[in-house]
């Protein structure tokens, strides 16, 4: 609409995209710090607000009322109001979300707080409203005048500015990379970006007050969000901060309101043109240094490593991660199609002559997007789209213009901080004749989006041509976007891959003439874990009625399973099922269990949770609701407990003892002899869990510390190493891991008495067979037997390794034998010994086992074989012992 300002200048208020036109109609422009909920219904603005509406630029949409969502109630973010439309990308917590792409685009140039994307690495730091102005942060390091400043002084003592900035996550469009090959990042769709008006102080004003010294080159930022690897922090160059064209700001308002907790309340950094990961939230420190930040998150996040480096290989390349040339700062040119929407149908009989294809584009480093091209024939020819730059409307603000208490003085600035919108009218007849629509953007530096994807280990900065497939169906055109965010199904990329298409062949997975003669590999089959005939709906109350030992039910992916029939047969013992009773066991089950185990699930499937029950379980805290750090026993069978990594001690070239500090020095571990515990680590970027079972070396009665011997399986050419062991080896001291237990079907009670799946046995002789780090459960039982002079149980230990230096716990094992030489025998056999080895040589094969173990003594019935080692060893032992007439119930595999 045309409006006339008090200066007599007529402006046209533009709303883009043109449909639906609600950006201005729902605007608010209050300059106070109140966070009152605003009625979403458009109303006539009060007289004092009209001055704000008579502007040459758009104002942000009004926030709709929000509240704490049910899924957040039992998380550390239980105080934070959120919009239910946001799509969660990493489960319930931490909060990483993007809005539906169409909703984001339809809001127009500026996005509401409701739909602004969020990237949180952990819990949101809590800052009460009445403490916001008292929040302080420091400015120190290589400066002459370090100081601490409160938000109140930041507002009162410095000039304020307001201007629009588009923030973009470096992972925007990562889902496309994850479909091609799983990266270490979680799956963002194409809506990992948002634009808002930010109010605050140019950072250069603070730095000039501090007076950087001559050696200063970098500015490090650190937030208040405490994470597994310390507080989140990163850095940028000092000269960028001092350059007003860069527009780097210390912000305290977003769209005229004080910052929302998810967006950094009460103060944060805003860095236009760079990836969102540099704009640190909940700011506590600004430190000027001579080198880039050494913060863990600066080094191991927001990088584009060479495409040749796999996720597994990256775990053991610290020097590569620390190489600053792989760090991401400026955004690259990128674009997406928003209309037609994913799965939108255009009925040809009623369609207009043309269809308006439209979307967004953005550049980085202040560069403007100067062209957007569209092709309907895979790049053989291109059409030029029209581009609209709403950001330029703010450059036309009159002198002295104030918005939300900040000057909009940006007429002089040529750098581009925001996304732009493009559109093109295409004849429907041309769309009907095409197989797809593809676009590419170019910035003013003549950098154009690439045709093909550059895959990298973190899946960041993905910006190949954006492609929408056109399907002809029943007199209509159906449009299919490349992916859908998170775990949402849909998109042509998943469809093509399921059918065996090669997404890296340069033709978007379509068969080329050269590939027609090739037989494609069998598409990966998804294991069905449900029974299609089961239609029962189960409530939370019904599920909770089965949280005991008698008839335990558990949940995987929203489906309910009855574990009762498998209690006696579960390899991990009945406790593994009982401990999961009436709980969502999805993460543990999917992480630990084999494909064979998953294929067995349909026979135990009894129903599906209703929506209320699903939400209730999703919101359940993972840790005990009464997880008292002063409790006497550390392990909790149903809940994860945190232990801090204190030391790593090398015991061989590829094995270490990891020592973890418990909650307090008098706290016992709580692990019965012969049982094990679960250790969980989460990838800091993806939040995906890695869970493995380990048997500690610690004494059963040990207190305050937990020692675990772990063999590190490293990557070798052609064979990836151990995901968990390499992850454990790479985490720094002071990092915590999650631990839960005990689990296991075997427990040694002393003097030959033990239980197997709850059944009591009295054993006269144990045959213990192990290899490598499989010695640890054997170690536990042998120590218990030999430590008790009154325990007459005989033990034969057969320990296999490659070479002499690989024999783990050798001195300790020898000491155990020395304590009870009459009833304990220990034999070492090496498969690759050197010339000095005088012991047994070769593999633990049939002849070796027959010679030293002998057949099962039927008249006795009190012998038992305990086995722990690689799968190949366990299979050999199993088959040989069966041939020697040993019964399956007398063989136990840890």
UniProtKB/Swiss-Prot annotation:
Extent of Basic and acidic residues compositional bias: 69-79
UniProt EC number: 1.7.1.3
Chain residues that bind Mo-molybdopterin: 169
Catalyzed chemical reaction(s): nitrite + NADP(+) + H2O = nitrate + NADPH + H(+)
GO biological process, one term: sulfur compound metabolic process
Cofactor binding, note field: Binds 1 FAD.
Polar residues: bias regions: 7-16
Pfam family, one: FAD_binding_6
Residues binding heme, per UniProt: 570, 593
Similarity comment: family membership: Belongs to the nitrate reductase family.
Subunit annotation: Homodimer.
Protein name: Nitrate reductase [NADPH]
Species of origin: Beauveria bassiana
